Amino acid sequence: MNENIDKVIEYVCNKEIKGKKINAQPLCILLGGLPGSGKTNLVKKIQEQYKERDFIIIDTDEYRKLHPNYETLRKTPEKAIVETSEFSNAIEAELIKRAIKEHCDIISVTTLRATEAIDRILYEPAIKSGYQMEACIMSVPISESGLSAQSRYEKQIANGECPRFTPISFIETSFQGIKNTIQILQRKKNNPTIRIYNRGNGENSMPIEFYNNKKQDTKYSCALEAFINPPKLLDNKSAIKKINELYKLKQSRNANSIEYQSMKRLEELFGVERDKERE
């Protein structure tokens, strides 16, 4: 495995760094949010905003596919994430190290839940190398994140992809982790820019910034308050409709008990009365 991962690391680092513009005043953006919150569209928005910068996009989910046993692992998706985590994290860490050394502009895409690792592997090394730091964070209610993650999972199965199942329990834990990260960022001496976004209306709409700690015209006292009080976009009637559709899909393929546990938790979060005939 060590030999395989070394080869993959060299491949990824060369592919991502070679030919990138070197910046005398490099920018590192910590881009995060809960699963299914719309981080992919936020990456596009940031790239559009900073057209003059040639960002390296660092996303561990993309590196999982390079695992030597990926084709076998994808047949058991509940194990694939665990089995590929160490592999993808090793690639991420080395790519960050080399990108910082070369003064490349960086967008690091994560949930932002692993506060200590983010600080140690990315934030502090970047600051010491003269980087300007920003955090751009998607904020959606846990319930809407869970619903989006479940819908994405079903689409991946239908399309024959390697599905990424995300339990609601993981989303709830991630929410606490992001809160911790925001608190750490708010205490940083260099006072990084922190921007909070919510999803626009529609699956393919661009995220909307509703908080910026460098602007005064806001109803929120700090980034943490903005993150934990996002605008609610999905009404309960629409949520119930989506939940019913998900149940039908899961029943049609005899989904496992773990999936149904997450669905029950979703019903609780949305305040929906359970249909006992579905249990």
Q: What is each model feature region?
A:
Residues 1-20:
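N-terminal pre-Walker A segment at the start of P-loop NTPase domains
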Residues 34-35:
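The conserved Walker
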Residues 39:
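Conserved lysine of the Walker
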Residues 52-124:
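Conserved nucleotide-sensing/catalytic segment adjacent to the nucleotide-binding pocket
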Residues 129-149:
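Conserved phosphate-donor/acceptor-positioning beta-strand/loop module used by diverse small-molecule
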Residues 147-277:
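Conserved GTP-binding G-domain of TRAFAC-class P-loop NTPases and closely related GTPase folds
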